[in-house]
From Swiss-Prot:
Subcellular compartments: Plastid, Chloroplast
Taxonomic lineage from the root: Eukaryota, Viridiplantae, Chlorophyta, core chlorophytes, Chlorophyceae
Organism: Tetradesmus obliquus
Protein name (record): Large ribosomal subunit protein uL14c
Gene Ontology BP term (one): translation
Physiological role: Binds to 23S rRNA.
Keywords tagged on the record: Chloroplast, Plastid, Ribonucleoprotein, Ribosomal protein, RNA-binding, rRNA-binding
Length: 121
């Protein structure tokens, strides 16, 4: 579960390395899980890349340490909290996605991110 002030790793090559959640979008909820869109600020970035430190971006959460429970009763947990930076239309800003991605993103219509992922769990 991600809430405001939570730090996340970035799972793409958009130029950002660390994000801090500042708002969870949709329905006035306080926490976000896999597939939810957040507004975040870039806390650490690579030099000479489009995204700079202190840029405000939208991101979709692709991995959480808390995990999600699936319909068949299986609990899916990851080692870290990670997100992919997206634009207003929901397309990823980067061209590559690193690490495993949860299958729940396909149900939330983030098919472009799922197609870029090396592994869908």
């Amino acid at each position: 579960m991600i809430q405001p002030q939570s730090y996340l790793n970035v799972a793409d090559n958009s130029g950002a390395r660390k994000l801090m959640c500042i708002r969870v979008l949709g329905g006035g909820r306080q926490t976000a899980t896999i597939g939810d869109v957040i507004i975040a600020v870039v806390k650490d970035a690579l030099p000479n890349m489009p995204l700079k430190k202190s840029d405000v971006v939208r991101a979709v959460i692709v991995r959480t340490s808390k995990g999600v429970r699936r319909e068949n009763g299986m609990m899916l947990c990851f080692d870290d909290n990670a997100a992919v930076v997206i634009n207003k239309e929901g397309n990823p800003r980067g061209t590559r996605v690193f690490g495993p991605i949860a299958r729940e993103l396909r149900d939330r219509n983030f098919t472009k991110i799922v197609s870029l992922a090396p592994e869908v769990v």
